[in-house]
UniProtKB/Swiss-Prot annotation:
Function: This magnesium-dependent enzyme catalyzes the hydrolysis of ATP coupled with the translocation of calcium from the cytosol out of the cell, into the endoplasmic reticulum, or into organelles.
Keyword Magnesium: yes
Binding site for Mg(2+): D740, D744
Taxonomic lineage of the native organism: Eukaryota, Viridiplantae, Streptophyta, Embryophyta, Tracheophyta
SUPFAM superfamilies: Calcium ATPase, transduction domain A, Calcium ATPase, transmembrane domain M, HAD-like, Metal cation-transporting ATPase, ATP-binding domain N
Organism: Oryza sativa subsp. japonica
Cytoplasmic topological intervals: 1-155, 202-241, 359-384, 828-829, 900-942, 995-1021
Gene: ACA6
Free-text comment on this protein's domains from its UniProt entry: The N-terminus contains an autoinhibitory calmodulin-binding domain, which binds calmodulin in a calcium-dependent fashion.
Regulation of activity: Activated by calmodulin.
Protein known as: Probable calcium-transporting ATPase 6, plasma membrane-type
Amino acid sequence: MEGGRSWSIESYLNEYFDIPAKNPPGEARRRWRRAVGLIVRNRRRRFGRFSDVDAIDEAQRRKILVRVKQYHLPPELIEEGFCISPDELAAIANMREDYTMLRMHGGINGISRKIKASLEDGAKETDIATRQMLYGANRHAEKPPRSFWMFVWDALHDLTLIILVVCALVSIVVGLATKGWPMGIYDGFGIILSILLVVLVTATSDYQQARKFMELDREKQKIYIRVTRDKKTKEVLVHDLVVGDILHLSIGDVVPADGLFISGDCLMIDESSLSGESEPVNISEERPFLHAGNKVVDGAAKMLVTAVGTRTEWGKIMGTLNGDGVDETPLQVKLNGVATIIGQIGLVFAVLTFLVLLARFLADKGMHVGLLNWSANDALTIVNYFAIAVTIIVVAVPEGLPLAVTLSLAFAMKKLMHDKALVRHLAACETMGSASCICTDKTGTLTTNHMIVDKVWIGDVKFVGDKKNSELKSTISERVMAILIQGIFVNTASEVVKGDDGKNTILGLATETALLEFGLSLEEHLYDDYNKLTRIKVDPFNSVKKKMSVTIQLPNGGIRTFCKGASEIILEQCNTIHNTDGNIVPLSEMQKHNVLNIINSFASEALRTLCIAFKDMDEFPNDQPISDDGYTLIAVFGIKDPVRPGVKDAVRTCMAAGIRVRMVTGDNINTAKAIAKECGILTEDGIAIEGQQLNNKSSDELKELLPKIQVIARSLPMDKYKLVTSLKSMYQEVVAVTGDGTNDAPALHESDIGLAMGITGTEVAKESADVIIMDDNFETIVNVARWGRAVYLNIQKFVQFQLTVNIVALIVNFVSACIIGSAPLTAVQLLWVNMIMDTLGALALATEPPNDEMMKRPPVRRGDNFITRIMWRNILGQGLYQLLVLATLMVIGKKLLSIEGPQSDKTINTLIFNSFVFCQVFNEINCREMEKINVLQGIFRNWIFVGILTATVIFQVIIVEFLGTFANTVPLSGELWLLSVVIGSISMIISVILKCIPVEFNKTNTKPHGYELIPEGPEIL
């Protein structure tokens, strides 16, 4: 008791071993490392895989200083026809505000000539390999992969194993002096063999995990960008980018290399990652420098690549961090705390056991031969006592506890990668298991994102179905048709490119592609002509404005602006309309109402609606923006985007799992409601609301309304941000949110789990996310939640298993030392038990795949105790049974089983050891299910579990029957083998009895959508 407060495991863990899942501060990371203190066997293995806090701080402080100096042109560059060195080229972009070097080389045109690149056509395909060799590849400095023997070396740094090696060597020396060759080496050599086996198994496990993480890292680096090479626009991997490439940047991209601005529209760059400047910077011909690592927050542009990889400022900084490990997860830190507590208890038990054994030995020696009469055998006995004490520490300090989290996460992440989910941050995988709410986008996530123009409305006429194109051509005047096609072809961010096979391919977003395909199906031959028109100004689409506009110079003089976007927004900008005859007539309120009815009718059929409009001007207003009125409405489009197969079942699975699904979309509210109903998201008592209405609600109104909100339509990115923060602050929800745009970054960052779309998502969104959904599919999101729950549950199973072994092993050896004066479990035997418990146990239990039952229980509440009452019931029940059985064998086993003769002590100790191991084998099966009685269901689907159990039994037979000389065992009779198996198997009956004992749940509040929460574990005073 301290200050009137009771001490508990959870309060201790929360004080010292609690870190946030996202962006943990450096001090929190240092705090838990300090709290672990000396209770760690192998610091290299325990901490080596985590990121170096000091290295991160150093990288943040590092400033790259670039000085103008004399540059020399290497002969290999001259030979290939290049006229500027890589270092000088890299220095130009780093001059930032100083244009001296750029002007000295003749500006961007001079630079392009010196690197043999065309500002229109890019670099030649045949020069790519040469450019990579001379100017560098677009990769950061990478540490070479660690070999298997380096992991062996790490495992050998376990302090307790080192002490055991010393004990073994002393045992061999003393043994040779007393027993001679070869009898004298058996005890010590047995310990050394056991240590080597532990080291090899540990190193193999760590090596396999490292390989899995390397594969995941390679997947993370697969980023595609659009470049122009040899007059062709194509997508290439970011690592294949070379100096001289013409790179196409658009909103949401992360600039992958240093370069110079060629041309573009309203390009705004976030340079905070390098300069710390919070305000976006406008990049233009007057300020042309672009730097790797910066983000495009608005606009689009083409840039000439001038430096790649480690020659960029960003590349140098990233090179200092590369390979420095991963951030630790909250569960790993908490389990380090549990390991520390158990280790402290184990250390006390080890010291007490050694002192009791030593005291009994000295007392016995004093009574019989005197304390001054010492022999080599006496020294050997004390060495063995010390080895047993050290081995108790090996068993008691569960290194495998926090490492099992890494193993389970690595296994889950590898499986998820095959299932099209790339986990960027380890903590996200475990946090997703606690998700109670998913805020999802509609387009591409719930729908297929394969869009087609299904319906068109022009001048009071609706065109529907397969014949709409022919009917439209025959009904609409040539003037209206020409303006419509011109508006589609010039007002687009997509591009038609010809592939190597001669076929046209459209590069761009799905909505743009649908409109462009529609335009090409009407008048494909006009695309090249209209594409040559001079674009005076382009205002790109973003999720705030919900529209895109383009101003062009007409061939016969005059200016025309096209605008397309969200139907209601474009309609508000129009005061005239084109009729089918080609005449422009005023748009009356009645006609506007009719158009709104058309929009709503399209939307109610789950169609995405867009309007396109135009206005003509005599001249472009250079000194002020184009006004948002005076437009002429051309057409309303209804774009079909079918719901993905399986989404409805996935939503139903979420509901059963206590996960509320909310749809957040920029679409019309009628479209949103129709899609939400089709997906099963919008229920009869649910509410669909527009983003503006959400923002107008007071805090009290929002708190009352929030549990019922299922759809937010016409939402802005900050609406999504407000929804996330409100759910977290008002209802303590664990929120997962999807995002694909640059403006989604705040919501992705604020959420507990940010999910970026791999296909439609921008690089800025992906960079802010914790998980990338590679196929943009909602079913994949549900699969991530399923695996997250599996990770959490698997670690709980492993902790339950390991704590049972810890308790029994510690108490058996300590009580035996006190009562009998010897330890029934020798150092070699304890090392074998430690391997079953640590590495093999983790492999068996931490790699259990998810099952359907996991999605029929509520999520774990934020702040819930990790070790639950159910776990304590199972641990204490199994521990008590094992202690009673082993104590019985220890005290009256020889008499009960009529074991006699010179080998009777060794026989009963071997039986105790064998029974103890088989108790763990069967308890490992019990731990597959903490609550369900049927623990065998699906066991053969997990071949790792079955394989490890089989291997454990086989090795146990070998140790007992054939390695007795080293393991201090004797072969057992068939009856004693059967007895060992029966004793172990009874633990399964004990498990059934324990699971029938009701556990008192803590009183908890229910969540707003009505599910009960998992109970907390007991406090230990």
